[in-house]
Each structure stands twice: as structure tokens, then as C-alpha cells.
């Protein structure tokens, strides 16, 4: 069996793959002399094909990397840019080499992953500073990776981003977080009070809401974590928890008096015996969140 790191384990692979991952330059020269296209993906398994440079970078085979680049391998492939592979699998020597030969440090792959995210996926935390120093700065590009890193609870990594000026309130939508949460909202959704306090201590804003109006406090209420909810309540403006202010906020919705009374009561749920849903539970009046459905 041949293990190509996280690309998979294979019973057998084409000889050219062995030549690439073992740095057999004479074998590569022989293939080139017979018309081999060094940018054409190689079928490694039934559902797995990878370019020669990708294989060399994944396996960190420097002789093959250098030979392929010298013979015209594409460094800025749209699906798998060499810089992302280098920071995910390689070391400083490999990273510097591909950059010196034209690799784009701002490249994104086919699923819009950038260099910081790639390094985190590969757990190559030592490459984060290298990426920043090469001009793909934390201040401009680090927000997405920082938010994704919240759930890993690696405080050393989070310290790196914060110390280098990351936007701690980054909340742009993406495929993972289309509802525009801040890192603090993500931590609240994972019911991680320690992380929430850490983020607040470093300047996270407790009042920024998600796309549907949920903020850290209301997320804590929804999750049923009253300790976290009380923590956020002490940090929020007093008017957020004032009944008259809430009624003014809800006035445009023209709520029936019966509904207002229900939301002020102690029983905030009702059962649905003939439905796929067991019951519906509501937030208290002061914690309701106005939002628009659809457009």
C-alpha cells in the first residue's frame, strides 16, 4: 500500500507517481523525452487524479518540485495553486522556492480557500507567520481563517491572528457561515464561554448581530446557557433589556396583545401532537429578534 498523505492510500500507483514522490529525476527525464505533459493530471486511483506538481508538493519532494517548475509546471493552477499546497504541506524552503518562481501568495483554490486556511487545514501553524510576512497579511486576509479557527480552540493560533491585527469582528458571509456571524457569535453557538470571554477581552463587539438579527446574548438564550446569557447581558447596553424599548422596536410588526401576553408569560412553548415537530418554543418578549423572511 502506498500512502500519499491525506490524498489517500493506494494499493498501486503508476510508475511516474513513484518517480515524482521519490525524486527520481532520470525517470522524469525519460518520461519527458517521450512527450509527457507535465501539467496533465495523473490518475492515481479510480476517483483520484492529481497533477505532477501537486503530488511533489504534497509529498514535499524538493528535487521533483524544482525539476517540474524548471520544466514549465504551472504554479498558479486555478484548482490547486502551488502556494496553497506549499503552505499546507511544506516548509519554508518549499514555500520560498515556489514564491521566488512566481507563485501567487493571494491565490484561492476552487472552493475559495486562501493560504491561511490551507495552513490551518494542514496544521502547519508555523507557516502562518511566513504567509503574513510574504504579503498575504492578517489584517487584510485573515478574518475568514480566524473565524474558522474558533471551533478548534487553539489559542496559540488565535493569538497569532489577534497579535497581527485581524478583524476580530469579521462577519462576511461564505459557504460555511452564510448567516454572517462574527467569531463571537460562532463561539456562542458552540456554547464556549471561555472562548467568548477570550474574544471579548480582545475587543469583540457583543452588539453585532447575524443576518437574522441574532446576537451573542440571544444565541445564549436560544442555547439555554443562562450563565453565558448573563455574562453577555452585563456587557450590553441597558436599553437592550428595557421593556419599553423592546415594545418600540416591535411596534412596526403590530403584534396582537394576546401574543405579547404569551411572550411575557412563563410557558413559552406549545406542543404539536399531530406534527413532525414535537413542540415550538419561543424566546421571551425582551429577547425576541425581529427579522425579515425572504426578500
Label each region the model flagged.
Residues 8-18, 41-55, 76-85, 108-116, ...:
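Ankyrin-repeat boundary/"N-cap" motif
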Residues 29-38, 66-74, 96-104, 129-137, ...:
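Ankyrin repeat domain, specifically the short helix-to-loop turn at the C-terminus of the second helix
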Residues 56-124:
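A generic tandem-repeat structural signature
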Residues 103-166, 174:
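Solenoidal tandem-repeat scaffolds enriched in leucines and small polar residues
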Residues 212-295:
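A surface-exposed partner-binding patch
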